[in-house]
């Protein structure tokens, strides 16, 4: 086995694990968030920190997911090019979401109470460019890239990506966008869409 082949096998193994772990961590974030809100202690403190650590880990887990899905498109041709564009679009969005999670964690550690944390967020979000780059526009590329990639593979790799997978990804994205309380359900939709892909990763 060549070095390149060994790296590909390792990348696919990582992607296969991440296809399970990524949605699970996001679901965990949603559950912890709900628990924290239920006990009226969702601000600076344990629940906030735990939830956002799970969120950060979940987003990072999608990095190998994007790379693994891109690899399923083949080595060359228009499909590979389109998959590469979709993957890098998703990764750009993931980078913005990671920054958002780090800001949330930092505010949680630094603030003494919810009021102080809110004031910190106001200062950060008041910096020109921060809102579109970190909170509103660029983070959406994560979901758009994932949806585009899964949709593309549903046509290119019907043996691996089920035809209903893009519908589940879209449903999960919409649920999480409409109401953060639906994060666990949305994450389960993502997991159901991505789980069958694991067997298509060569390794």
Set out the residue ranges of the language-model regions.
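Hydrophobic, aromatic-enriched alpha-helical segments typical of multi-pass transmembrane helices
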Residues: 2-203
């Amino acid at each position: 086995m060549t070095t390149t082949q060994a790296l590909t096998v390792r990348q696919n193994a990582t992607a296969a694990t991440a296809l399970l772990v990524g949605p699970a961590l996001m679901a965990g974030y949603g559950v912890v968030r709900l628990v924290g809100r239920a006990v009226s202690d969702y601000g600076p403190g344990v629940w906030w920190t735990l939830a956002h650590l799970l969120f950060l880990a979940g987003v990072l887990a999608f990095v190998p997911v994007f790379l693994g899905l891109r690899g399923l498109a083949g080595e060359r041709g228009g499909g590979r090019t389109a998959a590469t564009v979709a993957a890098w679009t998703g990764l750009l969005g993931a980078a913005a979401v990671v920054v958002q999670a780090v800001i949330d964690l930092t505010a949680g550690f630094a603030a003494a109470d919810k009021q102080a944390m809110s004031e910190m967020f106001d200062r950060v979000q008041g910096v020109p460019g921060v809102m579109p780059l970190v909170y509103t526009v660029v983070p959406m590329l994560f979901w758009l890239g994932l949806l585009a990639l899964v949709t593309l593979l549903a046509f290119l790799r019907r043996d691996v990506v089920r035809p209903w997978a893009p519908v589940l990804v879209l449903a999960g994205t919409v649920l999480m966008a409409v109401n953060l309380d639906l994060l666990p359900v949305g994450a389960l939709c993502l997991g159901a869409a991505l789980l069958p892909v694991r067997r298509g990763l060569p390794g």
